[in-house]
Regions:
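Binuclear metal-dependent hydrolase catalytic cores
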Residues: 1-138
Length: 138
């Protein structure tokens, strides 16, 4: 991969994904932005747009990724559970959040999303090396 700057929008919708011909121009996925620079891949938000990004990344034998959450509303995290690189033990995925709302850590937020009755499996199904980190914005 060249070490230039590349930005790709995988999802730009707010609140809820949508489908249909009328959404073809901008797409129907919720928030997900990929930035590659200096040989690194940074992903901002994990809305439904992260699923097709994950399918593309799954073609690589090993990936090293940082995902930053602008905030943890459902439309910014819901695609994380379908992100294929999380299910490959050769991958490293670091999750970062600076705008948590409430007392939960980022790991607790994702764990809460991935539990009954909302989801059939827990975050322990992730096979990649996954790190959860919070930081103070400003």
């Amino acid at each position: 991969m060249a070490h230039g700057l590349k930005v790709r929008f995988w999802g730009v919708r707010g609140s809820i994904s949508c489908s249909g011909a009328e959404y073809a121009r901008y797409g129907g996925h919720t928030s997900c932005l990929e930035v590659t620079a200096g040989g690194r891949r940074l992903i901002f938000d994990a809305g439904t747009g992260i699923r097709p990004l994950g399918l593309e990344l799954a073609r690589h034998p090993e990936v090293d990724i940082d995902i930053f959450f602008t905030h943890t509303h459902l439309d910014h995290i819901t695609g994380l559970t379908f992100f294929q690189p999380l299910f490959n033990k050769r991958n490293s995925v670091r999750l970062w959040a600076g705008h948590l709302q409430g007392p939960d850590t980022l790991k607790q937020v994702v764990s809460n999303l991935m539990q009954a009755p909302l989801y059939p499996v827990s975050l322990e199904v992730f096979q990649a090396s996954v790190d959860f980190s919070e930081f103070i914005c400003g």
